[in-house]
Amino acid sequence: MSWARKVAMVASLLAATGEGSVAGDFIRVKETEDGAKLQTAVFGYEKDGIRVDLIGAIHLADRKYYEFLNTYFENYDVLLFEMVGGENLGGGKKPIMVEDPEKEDNLAGLRVIYETMEKALGLTGQAGLIDYTAENFVHADLTMKEFGALQKEKGESLLSFMIQAGISAEKPSRDPNTLNLMRGMLTGRSDLVKLELMHTMAEGDEQIGSLAGENVIIGDRNAKCMEVLEKQIAEKEKNIGIFYGAAHFPDMERRLEKMGFERVSNKWLTAWNVKKE
């Protein structure tokens, strides 16, 4: 696997950490002569008067993508969100700063990756713009202790999961053009870098999404989200959004179908809008 593809795979995992039900269904690239757009899906499912929308997240995007989402989320009775260790957010609560050395150690590497890619791509980080204090936000992910314990139990790490995603791919990802990547980085042309990474990111989500099952990063976190969903349904909520990385959604869609939900609508939101030379 080339270094350029590894960069794009890491970016795809951040969107996780869319013929058939594969991740290619939930994230796509739309190209024209003038530009290209990386888009995430909003797919709607219904059962017995209950509406559930899967809203695909990408954790580095254009600022206006997140600004639109903050307004869009107001339409839901409850909005279930992903964030390992985010149990102190949502429900109108102000963020609580908790000193947790284990959490700092686990997330230090990811924070460096986020900051590096934000600068290289000229994008904005999700965590800094999404309003996680909103009244209708409900945490639907593992706590940091749950996440760490499950990874230890299964011998899983972020690195091992990435490697497995690359090995298990049914088809090779499209390699970015290394010369174009370097030219973009050296000249500060973030548009060139994004154009090269778009397709590999979308295909990387497909590879990651294919690994649903007995793993922590996709399978166990999705199971926790479905537990929270069932609780909200039991509390008579009728209009529910789930804001999660697009790579989670092939497995999550299967879980919804087992619950009797059927897909009834789809729309696409533009996360990256890049003009070509």
Predicted features along the sequence, with ranges:
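A cross-kingdom marker for long, charged
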Residues: N215, G219, A223-E277
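Structured, acidic catalytic/metal-binding patches in enzyme active sites
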Residues: G20-D220, K231, S265-K275
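Alpha-helix boundary/capping residues
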Residues: L14, Y76, L256-M259
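Bacterial N-terminal signal peptides
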Residues: A8-A16
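Bacterial N-terminal signal peptides that target proteins for export
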Residues: M1-A8
